[in-house]
């Protein structure tokens, strides 16, 4: 009702006829923001750690698990985040004879290990009109989330001859989603948008650092360290047939997958000498470092999914000769010394 009254007032001020004859008959209308927002989106965070020390060993082990549902799309599994982390930090004193001799008198070994696994989904961000949130902010409350009864049949009849039209039904209740008219431009029914499957992002990251420090002589130390970073990440998903608006439709189903991997390792050897004479301190450092970064990626798409319950590339029928199958990939390598 408030929207209809404001639109009528705007029309009168512009010198044109009011659009709504009985604005008080429309009631509350659709609160699109209320429909879109995931109220009380849950956040869960668990942390556990164990630590201890002795004359020979210092150690810390920890694990964490974190999940968060998105405020927009979280209840549609379109905006969610999950992270698992594991960490281990240990230091070993293999021997310490510094009180008995001044050569080869101590050796310490350190290891730091960590692992992180992340799974996430996300919706389009930073879009004024095309995103679910942008549409929820600007759509008319006179529109309904669903077309039911005669309105549903009217939609099917209206778009029957539109070549890329595929109706979208809510998987939760089987109702037909409404389609905003052309006067709303790029805006779409945000609930229909959120009901579509989004890309599922994933990553695995392993980080390991090892070092050993040997006391060679008084004031003379040798330290060697090795670090490795292994990362694997990508996304998988599919696009079904759908029609949200003119210019916002998919006339063919597509399965896609993208995978990346990267490895970075670094080796350092350092010889250190420190000497203090009266009020003067001298330091000499001799070092060597080597680093290598390698990686690769592989991406593929294939159209014509046979069954949405198995939306995978190997369960689709598209052929490369018809332009319905693509693949790409490449390695990479950078090394320094």
Spans of model-derived segments:
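Generic recognition of flexible, low-complexity loop/linker segments
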Residues: 36-37, 46-49, 210-211, 273, ...
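A generic structural signal for short, solvent-exposed coil/turn residues
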Residues: 42, 53, 101-103, 214, ...
């Amino acid at each position: 009702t408030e929207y209809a009254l404001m639109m009528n007032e705007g029309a009168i001020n512009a010198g044109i006829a009011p659009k709504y004859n009985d604005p008080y008959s429309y009631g509350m209308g659709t609160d699109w923001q209320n429909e879109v927002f995931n109220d009380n989106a849950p956040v869960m965070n668990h942390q556990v750690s164990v630590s201890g020390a002795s004359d020979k060993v210092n150690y810390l082990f920890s694990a964490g698990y974190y999940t968060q549902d998105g405020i927009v799309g979280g209840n549609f599994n379109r905006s969610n985040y999950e992270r698992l982390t594991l960490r281990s930090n240990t230091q070993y004193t293999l021997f310490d004879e510094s009180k008995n001799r001044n050569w080869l008198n101590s050796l310490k070994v350190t290891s730091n290990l960590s692992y992180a696994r992340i799974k996430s989904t996300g919706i389009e961000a930073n879009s004024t009109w095309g995103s679910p949130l942008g549409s929820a902010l600007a759509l008319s409350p006179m529109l309904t989330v669903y077309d039911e009864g005669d309105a549903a049949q009217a939609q099917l009849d209206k778009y029957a001859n539109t070549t890329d039209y595929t109706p979208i039904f809510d998987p939760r209740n089987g109702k037909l989603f409404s389609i905003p008219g052309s006067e709303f431009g790029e805006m779409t029914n945000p609930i229909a948008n959120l009901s579509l499957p989004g890309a599922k992002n994933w990553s695995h990251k392993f980080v390991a650092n090892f070092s050993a420090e040997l006391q060679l002589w008084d004031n003379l130390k040798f330290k060697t360290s090795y670090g490795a970073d292994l990362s694997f990440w990508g996304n998988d998903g599919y696009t079904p047939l759908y029609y949200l608006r003119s210019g916002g439709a998919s006339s063919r189903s597509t399965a896609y997958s993208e995978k990346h991997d990267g490895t970075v390792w670094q080796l350092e050897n350092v010889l250190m000498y420190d000497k203090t004479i009266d009020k003067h301190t001298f330091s000499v450092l001799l070092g060597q470092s080597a680093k290598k970064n390698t990686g690769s990626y592989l991406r593929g798409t294939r159209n014509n999914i046979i069954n949405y319950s198995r939306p995978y590339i190997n369960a689709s029928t598209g052929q490369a000769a018809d332009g319905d199958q693509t693949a790409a990939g490449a390695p990479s390598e950078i090394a320094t010394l």
